Amino acid sequence: MARYKVIDMSPRLLPVDLDAQLVPGSFAHALHHLVDQLDLCAFDAHYRNDETGATAYAPSVLLKAVLLAYSQGIVSSRCIERACRDNVLFIALTGDAKPHFTTIADFVSRSRDAIASVFAQVLAILGKEGLIGREMFAIDGV
């Protein structure tokens, strides 16, 4: 009679080093370090919780989640919420933040101008690092 390995489904604790999940050289790793270099003060005007109110997710966390999602073809705020909850790469990139889909949708809809200014910063950083040329820059919108 054939013998099979026993599968143990009992509870266990698996420690996870979130930083180790962002593999050097990967898009997520580059995104993590790039967003941390950006001046995100343009997003501060959207928050009015200095004195009262709940603390908000840092714009860097939401921006990382949205940009990683968009890079993978995920544009729905509900799908981004699910990825932040279930996908180890999103969990690592956001520091295990679990923003609600309405928080994500609100961030994207009210931050279009701020995101545009961030894009200009990204181009400047990439140019300074010698990662892009100045001859031609094109984005495939398909």
Question: Where are the regions that the model predicts?
Answer:
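Detector for conserved single-position "signature" residues within domains
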Residues: 1-142
